[in-house]
């Protein structure tokens, strides 16, 4: 499935239906008086967070969403039928932003969360409601309240337990492939990963979701390489695994760049629990590893773990550490086997 983490859509609620202009007509009653009913209410635009989806790709092809207009009123004081609400389903973790992206209008963090986003217009008054002692046969009626409409941005922030960070070619994709069934693309060149990947890791009977974001570069927090978008995906991760390529030209400098970008981005990223690990240790001698570990420990103020995503060396210890930070697994409810396939509407 292709990953898309933002989409712009147009939404419009239903306008209210017009009130009716009608007069009572019965045998032997010459002047029956007005009996036009009110128009029906327009449909609402409702968003709902649904589980089981991690992309906004469907909104690339369906961009306009319009709820049904309310039906017109009728004689005999009959109110028109209300317009049908339009339910738009989004992945859990979706935010709705204003067109200028300056304001978060809604944030869907829980499966099943619903919000009436645009309210349908009220129906117009029928002519019966305009009758007065001086105007017994009114012909005016309400046309119904107009619909609400706007362009909004949908932005998806992945909900994962552990987020992988590091410079390009730090071995993040190899790691997520080694601990899960993510099947992320791996290559011996930077920027092999060009979109976020999710994988479910299982270790000692404990499952947790791992998010692999594309490698960061200097200036990512300000948008370089659209790194600000990628950093947004790890805002909700409970722990970060910072991988440093031990075989790189300057592992210490690589650590400092990523750490600086986390600090610059804000949103509490730099304060999240973090596991720091030297990767690709099978390509470096033990003496060099010891020196690097000491330097990084002094900078990071904590334990520096060692692993090789390619050979699997050190992976169990790193997974143990992640599980220790995550704590006990939350209780989950079994999915309903009769659930319908996902659709944006």
Curated annotation (Swiss-Prot):
Residues 1-159 form the Obg domain. Keywords: Cytoplasm, GTP-binding, Hydrolase, Magnesium, Metal-binding, Nucleotide-binding. Residues 160-327 form the OBG-type G domain. PROSITE patterns: G_OBG (PS51710), GTP1_OBG (PS00905), OBG (PS51883). One of its GO terms (cellular component) is cytoplasm. One of its GO terms (molecular function) is GTPase activity. An essential GTPase which binds GTP, GDP and possibly (p)ppGpp with moderate affinity, with high nucleotide exchange rates and a fairly low GTP hydrolysis rate. Plays a role in control of the cell cycle, stress response, ribosome biogenesis and in those bacteria that undergo differentiation, in morphogenesis control. This is GTPase Obg. It comes from Rhizorhabdus wittichii (strain DSM 6014 / CCUG 31198 / JCM 15750 / NBRC 105917 / EY 4224 / RW1).
């Amino acid at each position: 499935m292709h990953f898309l983490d933002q989409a712009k859509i147009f939404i419009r609620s239903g306008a209210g239906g017009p009130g009716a202009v009608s007069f009572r007509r019965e045998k032997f009653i010459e002047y029956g008086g007005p009996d036009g009913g009110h128009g029906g209410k327009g449909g609402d635009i409702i968003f709902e967070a649904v589980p089981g989806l991690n992309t906004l790709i469907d909104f690339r092809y369906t961009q306009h969403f319009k709820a049904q207009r309310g039906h017109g009123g009728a004689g005999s004081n009959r109110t028109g039928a209300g317009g049908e609400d339009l339910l738009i389903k989004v992945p859990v973790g979706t935010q709705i932003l204003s067109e200028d992206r300056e304001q978060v209008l809604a944030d869907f963090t829980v499966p099943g969360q619903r919000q009436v986003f645009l309210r349908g217009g009220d129906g117009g008054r029928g002519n019966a409601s305009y009758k007065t002692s001086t105007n017994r046969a009114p012909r005016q009626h309400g046309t119904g309240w107009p619909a609400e409409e706007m362009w909004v941005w949908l932005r998806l922030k992945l909900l994962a337990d552990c987020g992988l960070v590091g410079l390009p070619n730090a071995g993040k994709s190899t790691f997520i492939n080694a601990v899960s069934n993510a099947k992320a693309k791996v290559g011996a060149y930077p920027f092999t990963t060009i979109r976020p990947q999710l994988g479910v890791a299982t270790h000692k009977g404990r499952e947790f979701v791992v998010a692999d974001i594309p490698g960061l570069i200097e200036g990512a927090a300000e948008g370089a390489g659209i790194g600000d978008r990628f950093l947004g995906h790890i805002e909700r991760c409970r722990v970060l695994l910072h991988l440093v390529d031990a075989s790189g030209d300057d592992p210490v400098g690589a650590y400092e760049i990523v750490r600086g970008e986390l600090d610059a981005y804000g949103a509490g990223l730099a304060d999240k629990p973090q596991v720091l690990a030297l990767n690709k240790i099978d390509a470096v001698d033990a003496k060099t590893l010891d020196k690097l570990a000491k330097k990084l420990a002094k900078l990071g103020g904590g334990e520096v773990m060692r692993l090789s995503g390619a050979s699997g060396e050190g992976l169990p210890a790193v997974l143990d550490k992640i599980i220790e930070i995550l704590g006990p697994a939350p209780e989950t409810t079994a999915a309903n086997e009769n659930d319908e396939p996902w659709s944006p509407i």
